[in-house]
Amino acid sequence: MKYQKLENQEANWKWIYLIRKHREGENITRYEERSLQEAKAQELLESQNYPSQIEEWIKNHLSPALPIKLDQAIRARRKRFFNGEKQHTKKKSIDLEYAVWLRLSKYSRKMKMTLSETITYMIDERESKAQFENQMAAMKTSLKNLLK
C-alpha cells in the first residue's frame, strides 16, 4: 500500500461520505423499511466523533451496494490527502471555457507536451517577449538620446 491508513481520519471520511449519500436520498443501510433506515441513519449521525462506533455501524448496517463505492471514495480521498501535503504533487484546478481548453489541448498535442508544460511554456515565452520589448525600448531611448 502506497499511502498510510489513518483510522480516525478515514472513519471521519466514511462518516461524511455516508451522511452525504443519506442526505441525497440514497439508502445507506441494508434495511428496506423506511423507519428503520431513518433510525439507523440517525444512529450514524450521532456517532460523528466516535470512529470506533462509525466502523461498527458500517460493519453491522451498511447497504450491500455501498462497500466497494465507499472503499473507492476513501482510497481517492486518502490519495488526495497525502498528495496535498507536498507542493509538487498537490493538484490545482482552473476553470477554462471549452473553446480555450480545446485550443490549449490541440497546441499541447502539437508540441507533444502536457497541458501544464504547455501553459508553463507559454508563460515563459510571454515573459521573454516582454523582456525583449523592454530591452528594445531602452535601446531606442538611448539611441534617441545619443542622436540629440
Swiss-Prot record:
S-S bonds: none
Record-level GO BP terms: cell division; regulation of DNA-templated transcription
InterPro entries recorded: Arc_rbn_hlx_hlx, MatP, MatP_C, MatP_N, MatP_N_sf
Location(s), subcellular: Cytoplasm
Signal peptide: none
Keywords assigned: Cell cycle, Cell division, Cytoplasm, DNA-binding
Function per UniProt: Required for spatial organization of the terminus region of the chromosome (Ter macrodomain) during the cell cycle. Prevents early segregation of duplicated Ter macrodomains during cell division. Binds specifically to matS, which is a 13 bp signature motif repeated within the Ter macrodomain.
Protein family membership: Belongs to the MatP family.
Name the UniProt record assigns to this protein: Macrodomain Ter protein
Gene: matP
